[in-house]
Regions:
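Short helix-to-loop capping/linker segments positioned immediately adjacent to catalytic or ligand/cofactor-binding
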Residues: 39-45
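Zinc-dependent deaminase
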Residues: 9-37, 110-113, 117-133
Length: 133
């Protein structure tokens, strides 16, 4: 049975909202930069809320994504879902770290759907880092 929404909430509370567990500082900076770079490609004409995300796999590969809005709300896609989709498309199935880049000075927490996606591809100890401008 796949992990549930509450499973991820427990995990996020346990490791803290901001963490650098098991990552060297420069590696976290590189992953954060990928998330902010992806954010620049956001298609968000309705909310103007540009989000980027980047995932790191156990093999060291990185994948990024941005949010893509649609006039047919709620058919848009979150940055986390795009990054995870890119990862899966390339044959990877595990996340060892994920960074979510906010477009302003507040943290952008994953929505319920993205929390579920993260939980399905990430072990309990996976850090979820939120970055702000």
């Amino acid at each position: 049975m796949p992990p549930t929404f509450s499973h991820l909430m427990i995990k996020v509370k346990r490791i803290g909202w901001l963490t650098q567990v098991a990552m060297k500082k420069n590696n976290l900076e590189q992953l954060s930069q990928l998330a902010f770079d992806a954010q620049k490609n956001s298609h968000s004409p309705y909310s103007n809320f540009r989000v980027g995300a980047a995932v790191l796999t156990p093999s060291g590969e990185t994948f990024s994504g941005c949010n893509v809005e649609s006039a047919a709300f709620p058919l848009g896609q979150c940055a986390e879902a795009t990054a995870i989709g890119n990862m899966v498309t390339q044959g990877q199935k595990r996340i060892s770290h994920i960074v979510i880049a906010s477009p302003n000075d507040e943290f952008c927490f994953p929505c319920g759907g993205c929390r579920q996606k993260i939980a399905e591809f990430a072990p309990d100890e996976t850090p979820v880092t939120m970055e702000s401008q």
